[in-house]
Amino acid sequence: MKPNIHPDYHQIYVVMTDGTKYTTRSTWGKEGDTLNLDIDPTTHPAWIGGSQTLVDRGGRVSKFKNRFGNLGV
């Protein structure tokens, strides 16, 4: 491999929605940072076969519905 062109690959902590915390290696963040998940394999409808619930982070879904909700599709 060429030197000095690859991102830093380090240890981080991942916290799932139920509070479970595990350690993995990633290029995300810095060494020792914590990544808090909003959706994970224990809550995602595709993996649990549950109903379609939508998490609206930052109001994007609400903004879209306000803008295009009257199209009647």
Swiss-Prot record:
Belongs to the bacterial ribosomal protein bL31 family. Type A subfamily. SUPFAM superfamilies: L28p-like. InterPro entries: Ribosomal_bL28/bL31-like_sf, Ribosomal_bL31, Ribosomal_bL31_A, Ribosomal_bL31_sf. One of its GO terms (biological process) is translation. GO terms for molecular function: rRNA binding; structural constituent of ribosome. It holds the Pfam family Ribosomal_L31. It comes from the Bacteria. Binds the 23S rRNA. It comes from Bartonella bacilliformis (strain ATCC 35685 / KC583 / Herrer 020/F12,63). Disulfide bonds: none annotated. This is Large ribosomal subunit protein bL31. The lineage of its organism: Bacteria, Pseudomonadati, Pseudomonadota, Alphaproteobacteria, Hyphomicrobiales. Keywords: Ribonucleoprotein, Ribosomal protein, RNA-binding, rRNA-binding. One of its GO terms (cellular component) is ribonucleoprotein complex.
